[in-house]
Design a protein with these regions (language model features):
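Acidic, Ser/Thr- and proline-rich intrinsically disordered linker/docking segments
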Residues: 364-431
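Cys/His-rich short segments
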Residues: 228, 232-287
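Short, compositionally biased "basic patch" segments
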Residues: 2-23, 68
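A conserved mid-domain beta-alpha-beta active-site/ligand-binding segment of alpha/beta enzyme cores
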Residues: 205-243
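Soluble catalytic domains of membrane acyltransferases
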Residues: 19-27, 36-209, 226-227, 233, ...
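Phosphoinositide-binding peripheral membrane targeting modules
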Residues: 326-380, 391-397
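Short amphipathic C-terminal alpha-helix that caps PH/PH-like domains
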Residues: 98, 204-219, 399-418
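Anionic N-terminal interaction surfaces
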Residues: 282-342
Length: 431
């Protein structure tokens, strides 16, 4: 008989509400005692959430950064929560034990996964509570992306109160393009989003839309008023070119370079620097958008036009990574590289031709089944699930965000269900 794999072990677990003793010990000593103070997090309440104390309920939040557990759970202590966390994180050695000990729900992002839904429903039935970040992945741009498909249906099915947090300053503390934290300030608003009676009277689509509207936040716009200084030791823009790859002046793709507090185009010299308030300050004679988020959306508009051209394709050599069947990933790796080949996106979907484990290997995912990708850490690589198996791509160029945007916009152009925010679509239609 073959040895049972880590994947089989993980998906064979029957989860239960987390141990109150362990949760409160970690919550009070480590999170409240150390991390909340370290990140200068402050909590305000727009509703009386104490009336729900001890009941089963769900907390949702905008997914500002990789540190969001520090900014959500403390708002509701002494209540305890099971978190919903990306499936792949359970295979990383520095996280594997704590995630299992805390009865964390493993979720395969952006794909249907009945196991995760069953475990969430079981935890709620047994009197537990869940913290869920419905975007599925931490913010890339500094603002939200639409919540993952099915979020409204899930909340309606659970049928318990839905409370929320809205995090301001979380992205600027831990931006997607850089793994070094920048300490400044984080403001967290907590309140009540839905009562069970409200959920019962709403359609899943209405719930989903209200989730998107209530949780939307733009950290760059917030800091225009808040004026919080974030300390990055002179490296505010390090790796920012991986996120902002398009030059807003000459239109060059993958022509941006960054380092220290500077970002500029190798092709035309257009550039500037990012100060400790995240203000984009153009060099003399240069042209830059108002904020990095505005730049990001302009870049998306460029990619949207590109993918709608007849015969569009995007192709690149990539290395292929998978999760280990036995044991865990060490040195904070996110996958084991087991192959390589050519990845291609077109109007039909995503194609791969190459090798895996020394053997020829190929796959195809129809574009309507591929709304977006995940990113485990920063903007250096991306992943999806192929026939249920985590598959990570390491591109030769700094092109991860190009792949993300091109796939999302192709999915939308071909009638996929994961569309952009309605208010952004309306703005685009108005030109």
């Amino acid at each position: 008989m073959d040895k049972i794999t880590e994947q089989q072990k993980l998906e064979g677990r029957k989860l239960r509400p987390v141990s109150p003793f362990i949760y409160r010990l970690l919550g009070n000593v480590v999170v409240n005692g150390v991390l909340v103070k370290k990140y200068n997090a402050h909590f305000t309440y727009v509703d009386d959430v104490s009336r729900y104390r001890g009941q089963s309920y769900v907390v949702v939040s905008n997914h500002a950064s990789r540190m969001d557990y520090v900014f959500t759970a403390p708002a509701f202590l002494p209540d305890t929560f099971n978190f919903v966390v990306g499936y792949n994180e359970f295979f990383r050695s520095h996280l594997a034990m704590i995630l299992r000990m805390m009865q964390t729900v493993p979720k395969k992002n952006f794909v249907h996964q009945p196991y995760a839904i069953r475990q969430m429903m079981k935890i709620i039935r047994e009197g537990g509570r869940i913290i869920l970040l419905p975007e599925g992945m931490s913010s890339i741009s500094g603002a939200n992306q639409p919540c993952a498909l099915g979020s409204g249906h899930l909340l309606k099915s659970l049928g318990v109160p839905v409370l929320y947090t809205k995090i301001a300053g979380g992205y600027l503390t831990a931006p997607k393009y850089n793994l070094e934290d920048r300490i400044g300030r984080v403001d967290v608003e907590a309140g009540v989003l839905f009562t069970p009676e409200q959920l019962e009277g709403m359609t899943p689509r209405e719930i989903q839309r209200q989730l998107d509207e209530k949780l939307y936040h733009d950290d760059y716009e917030w800091n225009k008023t808040a004026r919080v200084r974030f300390d990055a030791a002179g490296r505010m823009a390090d790796n920012m070119h991986q996120l902002l790859f398009w030059c807003p002046r000459c239109g060059g793709e993958l022509t941006m370079t960054s380092g220290g507090d500077a970002i500029r185009c190798r092709k035309c010299g257009n550039g500037g620097h990012l100060n400790e308030y995240y203000d984009l300050i153009p060099d003399d004679g240069s042209t830059l958008p108002d904020t990095p988020r505005v730049w990001f959306d302009m870049q998306r508009g460029h990619v949207r036009s590109m993918v709608r051209q007849e015969g569009f394709t995007l192709s690149e050599r990539v290395q292929l990574g998978v999760l280990p069947q036995h044991g865990y990933l060490k040195e904070q790796k996110t996958s084991e590289i087991t192959g390589d080949g050519t990845l291609t996106l077109d109007a039909g979907g995503l194609h791969f031709e190459g090798r895996k484990n020394g053997e020829p290997y190929s796959f195809f995912i129809p574009i309507k089944k591929l709304p977006t990708y995940g990113m485990c850490t920063d903007v250096s690589r991306f992943y999806t699930f192929v026939d249920g198996e985590f598959t990570e791509f390491y591109p030769e160029r700094d092109s991860t965000e190009l792949w993300m945007m091109a796939t999302e916009e192709m999915h939308r152009a071909q009638g996929g269900l994961w569309q952009d925010f309605p208010w952004k679509e309306q703005a685009e239609a108005r030109g």
